Amino acid sequence: VNCSVDCQLQVFNWSCPSTPSTPPPSTPTTPTSSQTTTPSTPSTTSSKSTPSTPQSTSSKSTPSTPPKTTLPGCLDFDPPRQVNETWWLCNCTMAICKYDNVVEIVELECNPPPMPTCSNGLKPVRVPDPDGCCWHWECDCYCTGWGDPHFVTFDGLYYSYQGNCTYVLVEEITPTVDNFGVYIDNYHCDANDKVSCPRTLIVHHETQEVLIKTVHMMPIEVEVQVNKQLVALPYKKYGLEVYQSGINFVVDIPRLGAQVSYNGLSFSIRLPYHLFGNNTKGQCGTCTNNTADDCILPSGEIISNCEVAADEWLVNDPSKPHCPHKGLTTKRPAITTPGPFPENCTVSPVCQLIMDSLFSQCHPFVPPKHYYEACLFDSCFVAGSGMECASVQAYAALCAQEGVCIDWRNHTQGACAVTCPAHRQYQACGPSEEPTCQSSSPKNSTLLVEGCFCPEGTTKFAPGYDVCVKICGCVGPDNVPREFGEHFEFDCKDCVCLEGGSGIVCQPKKCARGNLTTCEEDGTYLVVEADPDDKCCNTTSCKCDPKRCKAERPSCLLGFEVKSEHVPGKCCPVYSCVPKGVCVHENAEYQPGSPVYSNKCQDCVCTDSMDNSTQLNVISCTHVPCNISCSSGFELVEVPGECCKKCQQTHCIIKRPEQQYIILKPGEIQKNPNDRCTFFSCMKINNQLISSVSNITCPDFDPSDCVPGSITYMPNGCCKTCIHNPNNTVPCSAIPVMKEISYNGCAKNISMNFCAGSCGTFAMYSAQAQDLDHGCSCCREERTSVRMVSLDCPDGSKLSHSYTHIESCLCQGTVCELPQAQQSRTRRSSPRLLGRK
C-alpha cells in the first residue's frame, strides 16, 4: 500500500518466492482485529469490535537479500512507522505497520454493549469511545437536593441534613479542572431553627463565580450574579453559560458536559462519568456507582452516616460567623435534628400525589420512596410553608427527564400553584430551551421542564427578549414586536421592519420646513423648540427675555421709587418715579409714624399727610416736655447744652425692709436704731455716691465666765465685755464637735475634736529686769492621726477623702508678742516706769 499524490491508498498484490531467508508474505485475507474496552468501574460498559477482512498486502520481494536480524519498518510513510505500530486513518479504519512498508488495514465494527444498572436509578447514557468509533454506557453523576433540605447523592443514596452554613456539594478529589466546585448556602427556614433550606447555589469555574440567589420566597424570585455583579440572562463568557430553562436557572459548562440548575427550592448537578467518575467529594458523594462510599469525610475516611459526614464539608463564609471554620480543633456544635414526627402532625395531601396513580407511569423509571418520605417530613416540620411542594416538584422534574410528563400542580388545590406573567402561560412539560424566532429547533428540544412559556400560537422573539410574538418579525429597542414590512416611528425616526439583515432600519424623521422669523422688538429673541403637535419636529418663535431689554431704570429722588408697568403685548416694562409715601429730612427717609430727629428740644414724627407740592409726607413737631420734680435724694440741676434740667443724685438712698428708706449725705454715718451692731454710711468717690451697710462681728462671749455685775458694752456699743472670773477656767483639752467636711462638691458631717481651754499665760513686772515679764502657752494638738472618710456626692456616688484628726491636746509654750501699737505704747511708757522707780 502506498499513498498517491492525491493522498489516496494504492494497493499492489504479487506473489513472493518462498525461501527460508525471507519472511513469509502476507496473504490476501483480513486479519482479525478486535478491541475491547474494559470498564474501570461498574458504571460503564463498552462495545467490542469484530474482525474484518484485510484489504491489502504489499509489496517488494528480494530473494537474493540475505536474512536480516531486524525487520525494517514502514520508513516511506510520513512520519515513519515502526514494526507493529498502529495509527488511525479515517472512518474507524486502523493501519498496522507489518514490516518493510507493508501496512495492514483493519476496519472496526462495534457490537452494542450490555446496558448496566445505575445505582442512582437513572438510565445510563451512551458515550463515544476515545477512538470515536465505538461507544459505551456510563452512569452520569446526578445529585439533587430539595426542601429543607433532602439529598440524593451521585450514586442514589438518600439522606437529610439540617445545617445552616455554607457547604461543599462537589469538588474534585484530584483537580483536573481549574477552580471547579459547586457549593450551597443554607439557612434556618422555620421558627424553631430546626430545619434549613437552600438560599444560594454557588458555582466556581476557572475565573468565574456564579451565585444563583433566592431573594424572595413567596412568590419565588431569583437573581444571578457573576463575580459579585448582577447579570442579565442568557449569559455566556469564558466557556460558561447561564440561562433560564422553565422555572430553573441553569449553569452550563459545555466543555465539561456539566450542568447545574437551581429554582429556589431545589438544585440538581449532572456531571459526565468519564470526566468526574471516582473523583468527586462533598455532600453529593463520590460518583462511583456504589452507595457504600458516599458518606466520605474531607480526610478521605468513609463512615456510615451521611448526616455526620455532611457536617464536615463546611466552607469558610465570613458572612456566617456562627459557623465553625476549617481547621478548628474544637468540637463542632451538634446539628439540631427535628426528631420523630410529632403525634399531632397532619400530613399534607400533596405528598400522597407521589404515590398515587397520577405518578404511576413514572414509578418504574424513578423510585418514589425517597421523595415521598421527604414530602412527609416537610409537611410536618415546616407546615404551612409550602415546602412539601419541593419534593413533588423534584420528583416530577426527574420524571420529565425520563420522558414522563405529569401535570401535577392542578391536583394540589392551589397549594403549589405557579404564577406566570400576564403574557405567558404555565406548562408542566415545556421545552428546556424555548424556541425563538432565531432558533426554532433548540439542541435540547427533547428535554422537558415546567415553567412559564409563550402561549400557543406565539413564539419567543429571541434569547434575552421576554417578548412573545405571533409573527416572527422584528423587535426594536422599545420591545414592541413588529411584522415584516411594518412602518413605525421610534425615537424621532421613521423605521421599518425588514426581513433579513439587522431587521429594523431607521432614518431621521423629515419635518416640514417653517418660515424663518426675525425678532425686532426690544427684549425679544429667536428660539427653536419642540412642536407641541409633533415632538419630533421643531418650530421657531420670538420669546421675551426681560434681561435683554435695553431701556435702563431711571434714578429717582429721595422719597420716590421706580415703578415698572407691564403693558399687554409689550416685552419690556415702562418705568416712572412715584412717591413712596415717606418723609424726607436731611437726606434720610422716614416711614409714617417714625420719629424724626430735628433738635434736642423738639419731638418730631412723620405723619401720613402728604404735601401736594412736594408729594412728600409732612413732619409734625412738638416741644420736649421737662421734669419739674425729682424723687428723694435727687435735685434738679442745669445741664449745659440740654433743653431741660436733669435730676441729679445728691444723697445716698438706702432701702430697708418694709419699704423704708434712709437718706444720707456724703460722709454721713448713721446707726441702725433697731440693731446696735449695724450702721450705714455714704461716701462720694470720683463723683459717684456709694452707700454701704456694715455689721460689727463680736468675739465669743460667755456671761458665765464673767464676774457678776461686770458686764458692759464696748465703745462701739455693739459687743459686750466683762471682768473674767478666774475660777471658771477650763483646762486645755480635746472637745468633740460635729463638723462638715467637703471636697470637690462631695460632703459629709462627722465628729471631730478641737483643742480649747485655758493655759498658764501671764504678764507681770520684773524688778530685776525692770520690765514686764511674760509667760505664754497655747492650747494645741498633742497627737494627731490621718483618717479616711467616705463623702456623699450629689450624683449618688461616694468619694474617699483623708483628713487630720486630733487625738489629744496639750498646753505648749510659745513666745509672747504684743501687737505693734501696744509695743509702741510700751516703749513710750517705759521712761515713766523707770522714773517712778
From Swiss-Prot:
Location of region: 5 X 11 AA approximate tandem repeats: 17-70
Sequence repeats: from-to residues: 17-27, 28-38, 39-50, 51-62, 63-70
Keywords, sorted A to Z: Disulfide bond, Glycoprotein, Repeat, Secreted
PROSITE patterns (UniProt xref): CTCK_1 (PS01185), CTCK_2 (PS01225), EGF_1 (PS00022), VWFC_1 (PS01208), VWFC_2 (PS50184), VWFD (PS51233)
Bias kind Low complexity: ranges: 29-70
Region Disordered, annotated ranges: 17-75
Distribution of this protein across tissues and organs: Coats the epithelia of the intestines.
Superkingdom to which the source organism belongs: Eukaryota
Residue ranges of every copy of the CTCK domain listed in the record: 732-817
Location(s), subcellular: Secreted
CDD domains on file: TIL
Residues annotated as domain VWFC: 472-543, 581-648
GO cellular component, one term: extracellular region
Disulfide bonds: 143-284, 165-323, 189-197, 732-779, 746-793, 755-809, 759-811
Domain VWFD: 141-324
Pfam families, alphabetized: C8, Cys_knot, VWD
Glycan attachment positions: 91, 164, 278, 289, 344, 410, 444, 515, 538, 612, 627, 695, 727, 749
InterPro entries given in the database record: Cys_knot_C, Cystine-knot_cytokine, Glyco_hormone_CN, Mucin_vWF_Thrombospondin_sf, Ser_inhib-like_sf, VWF/SSPO/ZAN-like_Cys-rich_dom, VWF_dom, VWF_type-D
Predominant localisation class: secreted
Probably important for disulfide-bond mediated mucin polymerization (link domain), as annotated region: 149-837
Keyword tRNA processing: no
Subunit structure: Multimeric.
Entry-linked PANTHER family: EXTRACELLULAR MATRIX GLYCOPROTEIN RELATED, MUCIN-2
Name the record gives this protein: Intestinal mucin-like protein
Species of the source: Rattus norvegicus (Rat)
